[in-house]
Amino acid sequence: MFRKRNVKGSQQKKAALRVVEDDVECLATPPVVPAKKRKIRELDDTSRSAVRASGFGRDHVSAGTQEAVARATDDAPDRRAESSGARTAVGSNVRTRVVMDYQPDVCKDYRQTGFCGYGDSCKFLHSRDDFRAGWRLNEEWKVGQTEARDLDSIPFRCVLCRGHYRAPVRTRCGHYFCGGCFARRVRETRQCAVCGADTQGVAQSAARLRELLAAGAGAGDSPDDTPAEEEPRSPGEPAAGEERRGAESG
């Protein structure tokens, strides 16, 4: 038996035609542009048309105008510096350059000893001047302030014996005592006599203390009334004044 033949081409053609009609409608509809962008675009078109109507386009700029624009561009850094007060105004035909020599070629041997084995044939400069960097020169004033601050914080006499320092030492907490006074106190307690911190029985020699006190003129003491240094005495040995008082009483 023969089956009935079904024709399918007619339905496919109708579907294809329907798709083509939808595409044509989409192409014919203009895209939706937001109102803000549309306004900006209209302003740009208006300005371009005005420039074209005046004949002042990009291709019609005169040579004088180009030169003026170039001069204004070159002088812009100078004008900014002038307005900020960094330096005085200079002409556009003047350029100033500053070269900083951070490593001067100075002969090290001649500077340290005054003698160089190469003699006059040395390629380095024979100079014994003191060269310092700019930041070092700017910090020279801090040296005096540091010493004055140290003098303010250091008592001009020993806190334990109330006398002048003999073989001064410096504790870990930064306080100064006589060497003998500190040794005798450590046998009793390790706490600092000034702040009460634990010194652990350790102290360093304070060699710069004598220089600081001499620079500060003893903080009110004249050099004449400064007694000569006495050697540290043992814990059981009496002082010289005590011996005299004992002899007078006897």
Curated annotation (Swiss-Prot):
One GO molecular function term?
A: zinc ion binding
A cellular component term from Gene Ontology for this protein is: Prp19 complex
Compartment(s) where it occurs, according to its Swiss-Prot or TrEMBL record: Nucleus
Q: What GO biological process term is on the record, naming one?
A: generation of catalytic spliceosome for first transesterification step
- Source species, domain of life: Eukaryota
Positions of the zinc fingers (RING-type)? 158-196
Q: Where are the zinc fingers (C3H1-type)?
A: 101-129
Transport: present as a keyword of the record?
no
| Compositional bias per record (Basic and acidic residues), positions renumbered to this chain | 72-82, 241-250
Q: Where is this region: Disordered?
A: 44-89, 213-250
Pfam families, sorted: zf-C3HC4_2, zf-CCCH
Q: Cross-referenced InterPro entries, in alphabetical order?
A: CWC24-like, Znf_CCCH, Znf_CCCH_sf, Znf_RING, Znf_RING/FYVE/PHD
PROSITE patterns, alphabetized: ZF_C3H1, ZF_RING_2
Quaternary data: Associated with the spliceosome.
Q: What does this protein do?
A: Involved in pre-mRNA splicing.
Protein family according to the UniProt entry: Belongs to the CWC24 family.
**Which named protein is this?**
Pre-mRNA-splicing factor CWC24
The lineage, from the top, is: Eukaryota, Fungi, Dikarya, Ascomycota, Saccharomycotina
